[in-house]
Every structure is written in structure tokens, then in C-alpha cells.
A protein has these predicted regions:
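C-terminal catalytic/motor cores of large multi-domain enzyme assemblies
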Residues: 1-171
Length: 171
């Protein structure tokens, strides 16, 4: 998501309706939704654009642990420019994430399930079983046009489909 936000700066932006000013953020600060016994908290991964995938994974684990153990500090909860919520952690396939103003967008990650899909193998259509995941994206239409939203999601989809996450995570 950090890579996609760098590639699509209007999604990593905010709009102030009082001043009618748009702010394009140079830092990608991603809030992650964490389910805790006291309710949902959204700690922030600051400057995610400068982190490797293993560093981001480590930050997610650390922030989630701090959130669940009531150890977050005020700085851990401020400065988000975008939010990611994992609706799939409870098995949900679809949801409509609610935008957190002044952020321009929030991305949901649904449950990953095997699905039959049509693939092209050697010029022939075939049915294959693939891991599939819906990525519901809610955005502020004052900041992000529908076509831009589509390009942003396509960037994420392409990264998910072509990445070697085992190598990226050094597994």
C-alpha cells in the first residue's frame, strides 16, 4: 500500500473544507485498524514509504501488540494520511470501510479464499483455483476521482499478483 500511495499522491492527500485547501503528504503514514478488548484503535506506521516489507510487518506486529496491551502513546495514534483495515481477520468477504476525515482513503482487506477463476494458459481459457481477496476502497470524491481510485487499486492488485513475498520477507 505504501508503494501505491507514493505512485498515486492524490490518494495520500487530504482536503480541508473550511479553507478549501488540498494537502499532498510527502510522508506515507498508514493507520492500521486493530481490534482490542476496548474497541477499535488505529495506531500509525509513520514514514512507511521509507520501510522495507519486513520493517512494515514488524511495525504492524509491534503496534498491534501495544494496542492490545494498552501501551500506545499519543504519537502512536496521530498523523495518519491513510488507513488500512483488515476486515478479513474475522472472515468477512465484503465491507464498506468508513472514511476517516481528513484522509482521502481507507482500504479494507477481506478474507483470502480459494475461488474458481478463468485463466489463460497457452492461449486457451481454463478454470483454475486461485487465492482471491476483495479490497474495498472508500475514498473522498472531493480529492480522488473514480478513475484515479481504479488506478490505485490496480497498482495494489498488480503488486499482490506479481510480488515474491517470501523473498521480500526473507522467509
Amino acid at each position: 500500500t505504501a508503494e501505491a500511495l507514493v505512485s498515486h499522491p492524490n490518494v495520500n492527500a487530504s482536503y480541508n473544507p473550511e479553507t478549501k485547501e488540498m494537502t499532498y503528504h510527502s510522508d506515507v503514514n498508514i493507520a492500521i485498524a486493530v481490534d482490542t478488548p476496548k474497541g477499535l484503535l488505529t495506531p500509525v506506521i509513520h514514514k512507511a514509504q521509507d520501510m522495507t516489507l519486513p520493517q512494515i510487518a514488524q511495525q504492524i506486529a509491534e503496534l498491534a501488540d501495544k494496542a492490545r496491551n494498552n501501551k500506545l502513546k499519543p504519537n502512536d495514534l496521530t498523523g495518519a494520511t491513510f488507513t488500512v483495515t483488515n476486515i478479513g481477520s474475522e472472515g468477512a468477504m465484503l465491507d464498506t470501510p468508513i472514511l476517516v476525515p481528513p484522509q482521502a482513503g481507507i482500504l479494507g482487506t477481506a478474507a483470502i479464499e480459494k475461488r474458481p477463476v478463468v485463466v489463460n494458459e497457452n492461449g486457451q481459457d481454463a478454470i483454475a483455483i486461485r487465492q482471491m481477496c476483495y479490497l474495498p476502497f472508500t475514498y473522498d470524491h472531493q480529492v480522488v476521482d473514480g478513475a484515479d481510485a481504479g488506478r490505485f487499486i490496480t497498482t495494489i492488485k498488480d503488486r499482490l499478483q506479481t510480488a515474491d513475498f517470501q523473498a521480500d520477507l526473507e522467509v
